[in-house]
Amino acid sequence: MPQERESRYVLPLEKALMAKGFGSISGGGSTLFDRAEPGEREILESCIDIELANLDEALDLTKQTLNELGAPVGSKLNYSKNDTACSEPIGDNELLNVYFDNYNLAPEIYEKVDTRTLYEALTTALKGKIVGTPNGPYTWPSEVLFYFIGPSADQIYEQIEPLRFEFPIFQNARVVFKKKDTQTAQTEIRIPFNARE
């Protein structure tokens, strides 16, 4: 998701820092993990490297800006102060990941719906709602991922869940909720094969 990281976080953050003379973006990258299917890899976390001229003020601006830009829960700000490694949690938005089955459904289902059509349907379902927007798709042989960032993963799912009655591609999809509530920080449901019933 490097392109989305660049447009959503990197460029606006660098603009805010440079406007105050507080620093600039010096790099970034992603850590990958091996998925269950052989040969498939997924992003575990993305990072942005920042050079700050004034740690205290620049740090406050960095936290404020990233939170305003919608940093998701689980994000961290790692830095060194007085030769001590520090880490602060940031981000108040929840995540909803929808992994569509890209292998086990009937061939005619894949023929009828492409990822562009699916993206447009997801966008329409959320239009005018302050709950989130779809990002993706990210495609592997086994699954296709669309992910959403917003104040409530539950509310996002409430808006897109009715689409399963219209699009059979929702059958057997995995839906992963990443929430602020530490008791239910990450939960997963599986939409049944008879998702249209």
Predicted regions and their residues:
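Surface-exposed beta-loop interaction hotspot
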Residues: 66-120
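Short amphipathic alpha-helices in soluble, non-transmembrane regions
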Residues: 9-15, 58-69, 158-165
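Short, intrinsically disordered low-complexity segments
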Residues: 22-59, 129-158
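Short, surface-exposed beta-strand/loop "edge" segments at domain boundaries and coil↔beta transitions
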Residues: 2-6, 85-87, 104-109, 155-157, ...
